[in-house]
Amino acid sequence: LVNSIKLLHQGEAGRVNQAINGALDTSSIYDKYFSHEFGLTYVDNFLGTEALESLRKFLLESTIWFEQKTGGYLGAYLNDGLASPLILQIASELKSRFPLIIKDHALNQVWAYKYDSRASDPVSDVTGINIHADFAAVNINFWITQSEANLDSESGGMVVYNTEAPKDWSFDTYNNNLSRIQ
């Protein structure tokens, strides 16, 4: 059998009144971000309710998951159907709401990953994503999974390490060489 990529259905994810939560305390976010050595912070309730619900529905309904990753999760990218008016609105609002962080950097890529809950089982072949580094001037990650689906209530689902990848490492090293990363 030959794998063929065919977008069978792309859900609706149109622009909303305000994609990024209007109640966010921008000053506090800036303070936390710029007080960290590497420019790092986290924000709860990042998206507004309407944007969050629309994005969840879009990702659940759309057949845009064309890349099967090692570890048993699926990937979707802008060029393969992830692009939508809402995704582009979020990118635009990030630039206008956080100009001191985003600066003049352009959006280069957006991706989404869909995980299998079996990844939390230590004896499962489904492991999810390994420790890695993302290559970006500014990297923004957000999780849109419903809280009740989180299998570890003490965690938000993502671990961010307080370490910068060495400048002499290649993309392959900081994404695939687990023994050197650890």
Where are the regions that the model predicts?
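Fe(II)/2-oxoglutarate oxygenase catalytic core
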Residues: 1-182
